[in-house]
């Protein structure tokens, strides 16, 4: 992971933390284990915050299951902002 991806990850984690209330370091550890399942309301708020933060559209699956894949989000954002 290069510096741009790492910085993007930390911004994504910050946005997720603002919704879930979980500590950023704990979220990073959670995402090392795989995607994080959240309820529908949190999912939509996380997607909205991340899209607003990076001024982009993530085209996330809005039908569920409501899993947050931090690495996939970072990949989408870095490809959009090349």
From Swiss-Prot:
Q: Which reaction does it catalyse?
A: 4-(gamma-L-glutamylamino)butanoyl-[BtrI ACP] + FMNH2 + O2 = 4-(gamma-L-glutamylamino)-(2S)-2-hydroxybutanoyl-[BtrI ACP] + FMN + H2O + H(+)
EC number(s)? 1.14.14.13
From the Swiss-Prot or TrEMBL record, what is one GO molecular function term?
oxidoreductase activity, acting on paired donors, with incorporation or reduction of molecular oxygen, reduced flavin or flavoprotein as one donor, and incorporation of one atom of oxygen
The reply on keyword Oxidoreductase is: yes
Task: Provide the alphabetized UniProt keywords.
Answer: Antibiotic biosynthesis, Flavoprotein, FMN, Oxidoreductase
Any GO BP annotation? antibiotic biosynthetic process
Pathway of this protein? Answer: Antibiotic biosynthesis; butirosin biosynthesis
- Describe, as the record does, how this protein assembles with itself and its partners: Homotetramer.
According to its UniProt entry, the function of this protein is described as:
NAD(P)H:FMN oxidoreductase component of a two-component system involved in the biosynthesis of the side chain of the aminoglycoside antibiotics in the biosynthetic pathway of butirosin. Together with BtrO, mediates hydroxylation of gamma-L-Glu-GABA-S-BtrI.
State what protein this is by name: 4-(gamma-L-glutamylamino)butanoyl-[BtrI acyl-carrier protein] monooxygenase BtrO
């Amino acid at each position: 992971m290069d510096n741009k991806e790492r910085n993007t990850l930390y911004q994504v984690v910050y946005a997720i933390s603002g919704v879930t209330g979980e500590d950023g370091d704990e979220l990073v550890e959670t995402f090392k284990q795989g995607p994080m399942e959240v309820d529908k309301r949190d999912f939509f708020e996380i997607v909205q915050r991340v899209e607003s933060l990076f001024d982009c559209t993530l085209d996330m699956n809005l039908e569920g299951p409501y899993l947050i894949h931090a690495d996939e989000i970072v990949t989408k954002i870095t490809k959009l902002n090349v």
